UniProtKB/Swiss-Prot annotation:
Biological or metabolic pathway of the protein: Cofactor biosynthesis; molybdopterin biosynthesis
Keyword Cytoplasm: yes
One MF term in the entry's GO annotations: molybdopterin synthase activity
Modified residues (Glycyl adenylate): 88
Protein known as: Molybdopterin synthase sulfur carrier subunit
Organism: Aspergillus niger (strain ATCC MYA-4892 / CBS 513.88 / FGSC A1513)
Subunit structure: Heterotetramer; composed of 2 small (MOCS2A) and 2 large (MOCS2B) subunits.
Classification via HAMAP family: MOCS2A (MF_03051)
GO biological process terms on file: Mo-molybdopterin cofactor biosynthetic process
GO cellular component: molybdopterin adenylyltransferase complex; molybdopterin synthase complex
Length: 88
């Protein structure tokens, strides 16, 4: 898929383990609220086991997948799925 019709998604920690990938390209445009459902269709169980506790960034800003209903992921955008981090 070319960058003119896709966006790049980066997976970190448990998201990377679950998908078996660090990055991949997905078709764009995609409404942000559909992101988790799209990933769930590709990786059954990921929504409940991983995504519900993750943060998501679009470009350099964190976004709320459920609340930001007007946000669209455009071709060439970069999205990151970021699981929670603990420190001690």
């Amino acid at each position: 898929m070319s960058t003119s019709t896709t966006f790049q998604i980066h997976y970190f920690a448990s998201a990377s383990t679950y998908t078996g990938k660090q990055t991949e390209r997905l078709p764009a445009p995609l409404p942000l609220p559909q992101l988790f459902d799209t990933l769930e269709s590709m990786y059954p169980g990921i929504k409940e086991k991983v995504l519900t506790s993750c943060g998501v960034s679009l470009g350099d800003e964190y976004v709320d997948v459920e609340a930001d209903i007007q946000v669209m992921i455009h071709p060439g955008d970069e999205v990151a799925v970021i699981p929670p981090v603990s420190s001690g």
